[in-house]
Amino acid sequence: FGDYTTSFPTLYERVLKPFLTGVFLSDPKIIAADVAQEILRSFVKSLPGIPAGGVGQFSQALAAPVRNLKLNERVESVAKDKVITNSGQYSAKFIIVATDPTTAAQLLTGVTIPKMFESTTTYFATSELPTDGKNLAISSNSKLVNSIVISQVSAKYAPAGQHLVSATSLFPVTESVFRKELASIWQMNTQQWQYVANYQIKQSLPAHLPGQSKSRNSFVADGIYVAGDHMATPSQQGAMKSGYLAAKAINQLMQ
């Protein structure tokens, strides 16, 4: 980001830095430049959105073509040609471990755990609409990295007859701090807003530091592959791309 910070210091500090901090859940200056540029291009080339029925729709869409799907089983070990769970053993010539990096490292040797960034997101419901737009609100001097009236993007997210506001911070803060910061961001009284939920995710996103490959080799050993955003770029796109590359490698071996 050297060119941006030197040529457009005000634009970077007031707009790009707070926006990208919310994207990477960290100071964007520590993120590999090629990764940051790739993700920025994805924002420019397409319109960001959310699934109308929640992010779980991604998992449902991926699972839909699977003929024999086993759920609610804890995987205890993975080895050549077999997966052992708390319910039994399954045999397979090829295995893809598509989990968070910590779980993958616990199941397999040779998988490294990258530095992980945390985040805390809180949701409030309100009868008074903070804005009639769908824009993401950012601030360079707030304890929150961003906020959005998520129900303006998809009305199904809000309780009946109300609007749903989402806000994210990079560290745990109290409900009262969320209310205070949101009052400043949206320029309105938030004391009557209804608290809905709070999600503190310790391992929200992997750090992709300079020198790391944008697409790591997913092959581990003995027909076992690993997929996840920690194997590509820290984003949903990265996770999907990693899964695609692992599946492609297996498909080529099966032909």
Model-derived regions, located:
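Conserved flavin/dinucleotide-binding core of flavoenzymes
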Residues: I150, A155-Q255
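Mid-domain catalytic core of redox enzymes
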Residues: E76-I185
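FAD/FMN-dependent oxidoreductases across multiple families
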Residues: I30, S46-I50, Q57, E73-R74, ...
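Generic structural signal for well-ordered, non-membrane alpha-helical segments
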Residues: F1, F8-E13, P51-V55, S59, ...
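Rossmann-like flavin
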Residues: F1-G49
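Amphipathic alpha-helical segments that form well-ordered structural scaffolds
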Residues: D3-Y4, V15, F19, Q57-P65, ...
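Flexible loop residues that form catalytic
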Residues: R74, D100-P101, I201, D229
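Helical element adjacent to the flavin cofactor pocket in flavoenzyme catalytic cores
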Residues: A36-N86, Y90-F94
